[in-house]
């Protein structure tokens, strides 16, 4: 028999109250851990105010912005004449390290720059391997930059797309990433109109923020399994946005050239977020536009491709919805984490979209 009166409320003194509060915080932490929202340590905050539990929950929330995958993968062999160097950028908003890949083919002339923002728990090396972007850089003679999120700023190495202080121009992480990009542009004399940004998951959400905040700097965006800018302002709204419920969106005055990839089997970030990115990217554009839809297949997966054209007939936005794909980089390399080798090659299609003659 269960005695429901055992837990009846009774007045407590300071020591007993503190013990109960610690026990409650411990229960919250362990419950969040069961749902993948914390590190699972089960240790409550010694401060007794729940702040550490909330910070742990926040880090765990961002950890959900990644597919199931293995540990980070070391970088692939660098071709003779190429360079994959580490550096750091500092401004008033903070410091971030980054890797720059300069292909051996750059000696024939650099065609542009692609900034690649990794997903949660990933590293620049791992992301480079998984997306295969360095090989495409060799083929097309562009430079690739892989900024690295600091674990001091997010315990799971996630970009803080949901934070109010990291969603606007000249503030927080957008300011750091924009400044970092400008530094690389100047160092390698990169054509100013051939600078693009792409990312996976939390990285995709930050890429979308950058595209809207710095249209003068980033001339197209690639978003894989991400969310629209302004989808969340705090932890609670981030949960809702990821689940496809009550997602917000920051209004825009000008359209942003964007290519979106999302799997229809994504259980981490609901596919409706991909459609929301598309709608946001088209804001500020003409009231009427031409859109085409096609059902196709590549790499063993079917997909639906919706393309919206601008007034000049150029591709303004592409939306790839891939059947059976979870929360992983489509057509990615199995040596990297959080990739699915099946399906269309997201990296190749992004590069094609970025460097198309009409861009």
Task: Describe the residue ranges of each PLM region.
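Primarily recognizes the serine-hydrolase "nucleophile elbow" in alpha/beta-hydrolase
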Residues: 185-187, 192-254, 267
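Short substrate-entry loop that stabilizes the transition state in hydrolases
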Residues: 106-155, 230-231
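The conserved beta1-alpha1 loop
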Residues: 115-121, 225, 262, 323
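Alpha/beta-hydrolase active-site loop
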Residues: 165-188, 209
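Conserved alpha/beta-hydrolase "acid-adjacent" motif
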Residues: 268-273, 330
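A domain-start/cap signature at the N-terminus of enzymes
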Residues: 1-113, 125-126, 131, 198, ...
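Short beta-strand/loop motif that positions the catalytic acidic residue
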Residues: 260-262, 266
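Cap/lid segment of the alpha/beta-hydrolase catalytic domain
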Residues: 148-172
């Amino acid at each position: 028999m269960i005695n429901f009166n055992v837990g009846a409320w009774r007045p407590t003194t300071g020591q007993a109250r503190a013990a109960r509060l610690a026990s409650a915080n411990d229960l919250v932490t362990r419950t969040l851990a069961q749902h993948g929202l914390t590190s699972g340590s089960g240790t409550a905050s010694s401060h007794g105010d729940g702040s550490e539990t909330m910070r742990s929950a926040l880090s765990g929330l961002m950890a959900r912005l990644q597919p199931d995958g293995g540990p980070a993968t070391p970088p692939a062999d660098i071709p003779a004449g190429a360079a994959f160097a580490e550096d750091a950028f500092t401004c008033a908003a903070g410091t971030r390290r980054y890797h720059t890949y300069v292909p051996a083919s750059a000696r024939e002339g650099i065609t542009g720059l692609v900034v690649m923002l990794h997903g949660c728990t990933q590293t620049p090396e791992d992301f480079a391997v998984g997306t295969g972007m360095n090989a495409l850089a060799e083929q097309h003679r562009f430079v690739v930059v892989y900024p690295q999120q600091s674990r001091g700023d997010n315990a799971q190495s996630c970009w803080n797309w949901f934070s109010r202080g990291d969603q606007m121009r000249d503030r927080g992480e957008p300011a750091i990433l924009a400044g970092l990009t400008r530094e690389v542009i100047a160092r390698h004399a990169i054509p100013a109109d051939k600078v693009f940004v792409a990312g996976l998951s939390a990285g995709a959400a930050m890429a979308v923020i950058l595209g809207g905040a710095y249209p003068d700097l980033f001339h197209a965006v690639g978003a894989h399994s991400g969310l629209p800018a302004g989808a969340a302002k705090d932890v609670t709204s981030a949960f809702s946005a990821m689940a496809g419920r009550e997602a917000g969106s920051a209004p825009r005055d000008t359209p942003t050239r964007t290519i979106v990839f999302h799997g229809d089997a994504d259980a981490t970030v609901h596919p409706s977020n991909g459609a929301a990115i598309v709608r946001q990217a088209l804001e500020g554009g003409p009231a009427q536009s031409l859109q085409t839809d096609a059902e196709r297949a590549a790499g063993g997966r079917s997909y639906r491709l919706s393309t919206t054209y601008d007034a000049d007939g150029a591709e303004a936005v592409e939306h790839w919805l891939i059947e059976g794909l979870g929360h992983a980089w489509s057509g990615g390399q199995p040596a990297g984490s959080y990739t699915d080798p099946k399906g269309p090659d997201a990296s190749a299609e992004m590069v094609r979209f970025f460097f198309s003659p009409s861009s």
